Every structure is written in structure tokens, then in C-alpha cells.
């Protein structure tokens, strides 16, 4: 399993979500613009005069994003570990938020993180110009999942990896409910086929509340979904619904 690439707008508390989305939109805009500057600088070297300004602005916003993510990931991993323990009590799920290597403490104040980002990007200016791309920043953040202290992507079975992913999904959903008082719509695409019956039953019981859409390819599993509407799709055509 590849590391879980971090989405820019986590399901963090509502006010923080609004601020995070605003920051993420601005960061993405700056990132796209700076990428164009680097890409086109070979034909128009004068564009590089803007490199410093965009790098400083990205560092300022990126520091705030990193700090948001660090706090949210800590909360998410704690909740996900509890979910995973209910599914597989003999294994321990943990994780590491991976951001720019120069950031020594993602929980530090934003000014400290910003300075570390600035130092990092300026030390890589020549490399960025040669690569024609932005080489570091929160756009490359990851969440590495660990099982019993070892990388799930490298050492976990398919079932373990799928259970890790489900644990994160269910934890995000529960954190959202704790904050907003309602569950978000949950979409699960063929996630049950690689789980044994005990884990299938656990997942289905865990998602009994709220709106959920599940796809599956096995009739045996679909029988367990009779609490909701079930319909079949074959050759792009949807059959009559059953309950």
C-alpha cells in the first residue's frame, strides 16, 4: 500500500476546516503558479525573478497547513487505532505524519515552521530550477501507517492493509460526527471482499448509522446488506431494487 497521501481539507472541526480549505486553495494556487514559473523559465529566464516571492508566500501558508495537519493526524491516528483494535485486537495500528524533512517539530508555532521551510526551499533553489518543479512543501505530505511498529505498506497483508484503510475511514467519520452531530455520507468501493467474515460483520455493524453506499461483487456479501436498498448492476444496467 502506498503511503496515504494527505488530502488538503481534512475533516477537522468546522471553523478550522473553513480556515484550512482557504489556506489550501491559496497554497495550491501558489504552487501551480510557481510550477509554471519553473517550467517556463528555460525559455524566459526573467520569470525566475518571482521565484523568491512565491517561495516565501508558500512557506508562510505551508507552515500553517503543516501545523493543522499535525494536530489533526494525532487525533485521527488515536481514533483509528481504537477502531483497528476492535477489529484486530492482537495488532497495534499507529502512524507517522511525514512532512518536509527540515521541519523538526510540526507542532511548533507557525513562525518556527515557516523559517524552517524557507531555509529548506532556499537551499534547494538550484535543484528546483533544474527539475522545473517544486521539490518540497506540504503538497508532498504523507501519512505512513504502521502495524506493530512496521510499515503497513511494506509488511502488511492485503487484509491488514484494507483494515488499516477502513480504520482511518471509520475514524474520520466518527470524528466528523463528534464535531458536527451528524455522519457524512460514507462511500465504500468493494472493501469487504478482502476481509474475513468476522471483519465484514464488524464493519457492517459499525456503519449501521448514517448514509452509506457500498459496492461489492459477491452475492454472499450482498445478502448482509438487506437492511438497506440493494440493487444489481450488470453491463452498465441497474436492475430493480430489493430490500
Question: What residue spans do the PLM features occupy?
Answer:
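Secondary-structure edge/capping motif, primarily at the C-terminal ends of alpha-helices
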Residues: 38-45
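DNA-recognition element of transcription regulators
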Residues: 161, 210-211
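Extended, charged alpha-helical "arm/stalk" segments used for dimerization and assembly
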Residues: 1-38
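Structural recognition of the conserved hydrophobic beta-strand(s) that form the central parallel beta-sheet
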Residues: 211-218
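Walker B catalytic acidic pair
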Residues: 189-191
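Conserved NTPase motor "head" modules and their coupling/switch loops across ABC/AAA+ ATPases, GTPases
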Residues: 46-185, 194-198, 202-205, 219-226, ...
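Conserved beta-strand scaffold positions in the cores of enzyme catalytic domains, especially
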Residues: 212, 230-232
Amino acid at each position: 500500500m502506498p503511503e496515504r497521501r494527505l488530502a488538503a481539507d481534512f475533516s477537522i472541526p468546522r471553523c478550522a476546516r473553513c480556515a484550512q480549505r482557504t489556506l489550501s486553495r491559496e497554497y495550491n494556487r501558489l504552487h501551480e503558479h510557481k510550477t509554471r514559473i519553473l517550467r517556463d523559465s528555460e525559455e524566459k529566464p526573467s520569470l525566475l525573478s518571482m521565484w523568491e516571492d512565491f517561495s516565501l508566500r508558500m512557506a508562510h501558508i505551508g507552515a500553517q497547513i503543516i501545523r493543522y495537519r499535525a494536530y489533526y493526524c494525532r487525533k485521527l491516528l488515536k481514533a483509528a487505532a481504537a477502531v483497528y483494535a476492535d477489529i484486530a485486537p492482537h495488532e497495534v495500528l499507529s502512524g507517522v505524519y511525514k512532512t518536509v524533512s527540515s521541519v523538526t517539530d510540526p507542532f511548533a508555532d507557525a513562525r518556527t515552521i515557516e523559517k524552517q521551510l524557507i531555509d529548506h526551499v532556499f537551499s534547494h533553489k538550484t535543484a528546483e530550477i533544474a527539475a522545473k518543479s517544486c521539490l518540497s512543501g506540504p503538497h508532498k505530505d504523507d501519512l505512513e501507517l504502521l502495524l506493530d511498529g512496521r510499515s503497513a505498506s511494506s509488511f502488511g497483508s492485503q487484509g491488514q492493509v484494507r483494515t488499516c484503510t477502513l480504520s482511518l475511514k471509520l475514524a474520520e467519520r466518527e470524528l466528523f460526527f463528534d464535531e458536527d452531530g451528524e455522519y457524512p455520507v460514507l462511500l465504500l468501493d468493494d472493501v469487504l471482499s478482502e476481509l474475513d467474515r468476522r471483519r465484514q460483520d464488524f464493519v457492517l455493524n459499525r456503519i449501521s448509522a448514517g448514509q452509506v453506499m457500498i459496492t461489492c461483487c459477491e452475492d454472499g456479501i450482498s445478502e448482509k446488506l438487506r437492511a438497506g436498498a440493494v440493487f444489481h448492476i450488470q453491463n452498465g444496467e441497474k436492475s430493480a431494487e430489493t430490500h
